[in-house]
Amino acid sequence: MRDVAVIGVSQTKFGELWDVSFRDMITEAGLGAIEDAGVEGADLDAMYVGNMSAGLFIKQEHISSLIADHAGLTPIPSTRVEAACASGGLALRSGIMAVASGYHDIVIAAGVEKMTDVVDPTPAIATASDQEWEAQQGVTFPSLYAMMARRHMYEYGTTREQLAMVSVINHENASNNPRAQFPMKVTVEQVMNSTMVADPLRLLDCSPISDGAAAVILCPADMAREYTDTPVYVKASAQASGTIALHDRRDITRIDATVNAARNAFKMAKLTPGDIDLVEVHDCFSINGILAVEDLGFVEKGEGGRAFEDGMTRIDGDIPVNPSGGLKARGHPLGATGIAQAAEVVWQLRGEAGKRQVEGAEIGMTHNIGGTGGTAAVHIFSR
């Protein structure tokens, strides 16, 4: 197996992009990554695109061919990858494996979602849950994560204020991210007084409905410096599955897919949680920021809330979490999220993150899950 490097990244602004089409968003991200990498479209051997539900959001399937055609990249092989909200992370992993195996040399891995072209995106999002046991019974993702939050509060004493701090820190970071959907700060009081969605989760505990796209260019590590002076190396790419339905979990305060993917990633990279300088976690709801730092091994079980409350997860803390603003404030266009996380880590390791830069960052991690944790992808990168 060959070592793999990231030589180019790009991300559109995330938000309610009414005047930008699905086709133009993904083309903007792809061409931006190609330019950043210093390659030509003709250099690309293959494309992998993460997308959860274009068929429901924009009534368009067969998007792999559509994107290659619209971007002027035909006839390269183009493959759509779907794993709910982890679609981007698995598209990245597919591209990494294609290069590592020697099957392709230069690959683009991208992600895109256009969520605002429907009146109500909830039915499309609900397809990421168990249809028979959850969606058809009226269960929504806010209510599922609310149950996880309530149980964590019961088991470990996690407080409402600690949940709010996840959002506060994300917005603090996003205020320095020009690509973020919500680049403004919020207070604990604002989070706790926002509209109730599913007790104990309020509106400002929840990631938004977003449009956006992101892309990365991958190549063999020994070729990377032919294109860039600042390659970022893939140290590990791991994926795990878990139960899709929440009621099947042995413990709803732990996402087993995250635990297993992280364990495999650390083993592959020959690293420990203490070696990580920053991490982009999948905080679709505030409780998942807390669960993520526990399941990834950064703190002991039950200590996640305290880590946010004490400032451990701030940019200048022991383990900076979501310098981009995370899903909560940067935005969460489902299929693009896993790629956008990787782009942020690359910018951080290059020292190109501006006011949100983690000082001296050498090693970064991304954590991307689907649904309530039926799928997890964990990647580790280094300078």
From Swiss-Prot:
The active site is at residues 85, 332. InterPro entries: Thiolase (IPR002155), Thiolase-like (IPR016039), Thiolase_C_2 (IPR055140), Thiolase_N (IPR020616). Keywords: Acyltransferase, Isoprene biosynthesis, Transferase. Pfam families: Thiolase_C_1, Thiolase_N. It catalyses: 2 acetyl-CoA = acetoacetyl-CoA + CoA. GO terms for biological process: isoprenoid biosynthetic process. The keyword Zinc does not apply. Pathway: Metabolic intermediate biosynthesis; (R)-mevalonate biosynthesis; (R)-mevalonate from acetyl-CoA: step 1/3. Its EC number is 2.3.1.9. One of its GO terms (molecular function) is acyltransferase activity, transferring groups other than amino-acyl groups. CoA binds at residues 206-207, 209, 328. Interacts with HMG-CoA synthase (HMGCS) that catalyzes the second step in the pathway and with a DUF35 protein. The acetoacetyl-CoA thiolase/HMG-CoA synthase complex channels the intermediate via a fused CoA-binding site, which allows for efficient coupling of the endergonic thiolase reaction with the exergonic HMGCS reaction. Catalyzes the condensation of two acetyl-coA molecules into acetoacetyl-CoA. Functions in the mevalonate (MVA) pathway leading to isopentenyl diphosphate (IPP), a key precursor for the biosynthesis of isoprenoid compounds that are building blocks of archaeal membrane lipids. Belongs to the thiolase-like superfamily. Thiolase family. This is Acetyl-CoA acetyltransferase.
